[in-house]
Swiss-Prot record:
The keyword Nucleus does not apply. The active site is at H176 (proton donor), E307 (proton acceptor). It comes from the Eukaryota. One of its GO terms (molecular function) is carbohydrate binding. Pathway: Carbohydrate metabolism; hexose metabolism; Carbohydrate metabolism; galactose metabolism. Belongs to the aldose epimerase family. CDD domains: galactose_mutarotase_like (cd09019). This is Galactose mutarotase. InterPro entries: Ald1_epimerase_CS, Aldose_1-epimerase, Aldose_1/G6P_1-epimerase, Gal_mutarotase_sf_dom, Galactose_mutarotase-like, GH-type_carb-bd. The keyword rRNA-binding does not apply. GO terms for biological process: carbohydrate metabolic process; galactose catabolic process via UDP-galactose, Leloir pathway; glucose metabolic process.
Length: 342
């Protein structure tokens, strides 16, 4: 049984509209999602003692989400991740996007899908958000209709993304939640055990754009096919963290993507997706300056992201999975976040 409660979360400045919060509750999970950026603001998960903790980073008030902050919990688009130099070509025409993370365009530009108000509709077991991205928004061609649907089923949070375009355009939608299974506000994720079901990953240049090589994980720090404890693993390989796309099987079917286990609490997160990739990011750019929920500060490595997605810069890399959505087609992807305890 799932209950859905609708409340006001806050008012946007200068009459920009009302941001609403939707709380989805089952016996195992409670998830708060707001209509600003389709953002997950809280996710309460029980530990093996039955004690619930909030396992996502974020803010208690709307003001937190309106400041400069690293996409906590938000849906990002029209194209998640980086597009090299903020440009791409379709049918011989070059399109220019805002370069909001020098020298590239990141997560849809300066005003991506995370920084707009969506129109909500309550469902029996969740909430659906809708918006129309106008032709030319942030430099992207064509009008794009987008539906993001969150549903709850026991211990599983399901996110479905659908989109339809009036002109050929790249589309790549994901959710940018930062997880800490010890509870948000815990200082780091070093005691998290991570598994990612990927035989290959994408090496990147110094601006975090894939070089074009699809590299086997075998014998590298990127071999996460068997569980590794993050802190030890980062030390063993002398790396400062992950911010890389891992290549999953390219089938459109639901497939196992990743597993995160926090031994002390017993909490386990399993991720399944229809997408061909997942960006594993260990919060390397968090620096402790933002004040989060309950007075928490978020230093480097205090949360991890598993952003299911198409591969970064695929609009410019023909050997990557196709990036374009054409008129008459439908973009349709689903990701499942399944929580349990052991």
């Amino acid at each position: 049984m799932v209950s859905v409660t609708r409340t006001v979360f806050g008012e946007l400045p200068s009459g920009g509209g009302t941001v609403e919060k939707f709380q989805l509750r089952s016996d195992q999970l409670s998830v708060d999602i707001i209509s600003w950026g389709c953002t997950i603001t809280a996710l309460q998960v029980k530990d093996r003692q039955g004690k619930a903790s909030d396992v996502v980073l974020g803010f208690a008030e709307l003001e937190g989400y309106l400041q400069k902050q690293p996409y906590f919990g938000a849906v990002v688009g029209r194209v998640a991740n980086r597009i090299a130099k903020g440009r791409f070509t379709i049918g011989g025409k070059e399109y220019h996007l805002p370069v909001n993370r020098e020298p590239n365009s990141l997560h849809g530009g300066f005003t991506g899908f995370d920084k707009v108000l969506w129109t909500p509709q309550v469902l029996t077991n969740g909430v659906q958000f809708f918006r129309v991205s106008p032709d030319g928004e942030e430099g992207y061609p064509g009008e794009l209709k987008v539906w993001v649907t969150y549903t709850l089923d026991g211990g599983e949070l399901v996110i479905n993304y659908r989109a339809q375009a009036s002109q050929t355009t790249p589309v790549n939608l994901t959710n940018h939640s930062y997880f800490n299974l010890a509870g948000q506000g815990s200082p780091n994720i070093y005691d998290h055990e991570v598994t990612i079901a990927a035989d290959a990953y994408l090496p990147v240049d110094e601006t975090l754009i894939p070089t074009g090589v699809i590299a086997p994980v075998e014998g590298t720090a990127f071999d996460l096919r068997k569980p590794v404890e993050l802190g030890t693993h980062l030390q063993d390989y002398h790396i400062h963290g992950f911010d890389h796309n891992f290549c999953l099987k390219e089938s459109k079917e639901k497939k196992f993507c990743a597993r995160v286990r926090h031994a002390a609490s017993g909490r386990i997160l399993e991720v399944y997706t229809t997408q061909p990739g997942v960006q594993f990011y260990t919060g390397n750019f968090l620096d402790g300056t933002l004040k989060g929920k309950n007075g928490a500060v978020y230093p480097k490595h205090s949360g991890l992201c598993l952003e299911t997605q198409n591969w970064p810069d695929s609009v410019n890399q023909p050997q990557f999975p196709p990036a374009l959505l054409r008129p008459g087609e439908e973009y349709n992807h689903t990701t499942w976040f399944k929580f349990s305890v052991a």
